[in-house]
Amino acid sequence: PQVGLIPFPRV
C-alpha cells in the first residue's frame, strides 16, 4: 500500500 508519497511494500 502507498504510505504518504512513497509506496512502501508492507510485508
From Swiss-Prot:
Signal peptide: none
Gene Ontology CC terms: extracellular region
Cited InterPro entries: Periviscerokinin
GO biological process, one term: neuropeptide signaling pathway
Predominant location: secreted
Compartment(s): Secreted
Residues recorded with modification Valine amide: V11
Superkingdom: Eukaryota
Key words of the record: Amidation, Neuropeptide, Secreted
Coiled-coil features, chain-numbered ranges: none
Annotated Pfam families: Periviscerokin
Keyword Membrane: no
Family: Belongs to the periviscerokinin family.
Protein function: Mediates visceral muscle contractile activity (myotropic activity).
Protein name per UniProt: Periviscerokinin-3
Lineage: Eukaryota, Metazoa, Ecdysozoa, Arthropoda, Hexapoda
